Every structure is written in C-alpha cells, then in structure tokens.
Amino acid sequence: MDFSQLGGLSGLLDGVKKEFSQLEEKNKDTIHTSKSGGGMVSVSFNGLGELVDLQIDDSLLEDKEAMQIYLMSALNDGYKAVEENRKNLAFNMLGNFAKL
C-alpha cells in the first residue's frame, strides 16, 4: 500500500468539508415559499428546513377545517421543496467531488 498518497487524501477531504460548509451556509439563506387555498395560507422555509414565516388569511379563522387542510398542504409542499433542494445540492457536491 502506498501511504504517500494519504496526504493528498487529507487535502481532498479538507476541500470537501470546506465546500460542504459553504453550500450549507448558502442553503441557510435560501427561502422556499409554498401557498395553498389560492394564497390563503403561505409558509416559508429556509434551506435547513426551518419554518421562517407563516401567513394565514383572516377569513380562515372562522373555518378550522379548511385552515387545517390548507396548512397541511402548504407545509407538505414546502417540506418537499426543501428536500428537493437538499438532493440537488448533494448531487452537485458529488459532481464537484468527482472532478477533483
């Protein structure tokens, strides 16, 4: 086994860690907004999957069932958008890793 290449591997891993940290920081600032009920409910998630904003039209305060349905729909759509973005970032990072 040629141990002389381990130094290069360490540098490669450091590069991957740095790129991952940069992507994670960029992802944190990305906002994904989903709406349901014709815009009566709007939710926004950051790239880390944290809910950062929630808007509910006042007219829904009288209709609990509709509000629940619209909230679930908007939250599920927002969560899917965050997950899709995470997958894309991971594939991009793997693509960049393959180039090294």
UniProtKB/Swiss-Prot annotation:
Q: What is its main location?
A: cytoplasm
Origin: domain of life: Bacteria
Q: Which Pfam families match?
A: YbaB_DNA_bd
Any idea where this protein resides?
Cytoplasm, Nucleoid
Which pairs are disulfide-linked? none
A GO MF annotation of the entry reads: DNA binding
Please provide the record's keywords in A-Z order: Cytoplasm, DNA-binding
Is Nucleotide-binding among this UniProt entry's keywords? no
Q: Which GO cellular component terms, listed alphabetically, does the Swiss-Prot or TrEMBL entry include?
A: bacterial nucleoid; cytoplasm
Under the subunit heading, UniProt states: Homodimer.
Outline what the protein does: Binds to DNA and alters its conformation. May be involved in regulation of gene expression, nucleoid organization and DNA protection.
- UniProt record similarity statement: Belongs to the YbaB/EbfC family.
Q: Fetch the HAMAP family from UniProt.
A: DNA_YbaB_EbfC
The entry's protein name is Nucleoid-associated protein jhp_0031
Please give the organism. Helicobacter pylori (strain J99 / ATCC 700824) (Campylobacter pylori J99)
Lineage of origin: Bacteria, Pseudomonadati, Campylobacterota, Epsilonproteobacteria, Campylobacterales
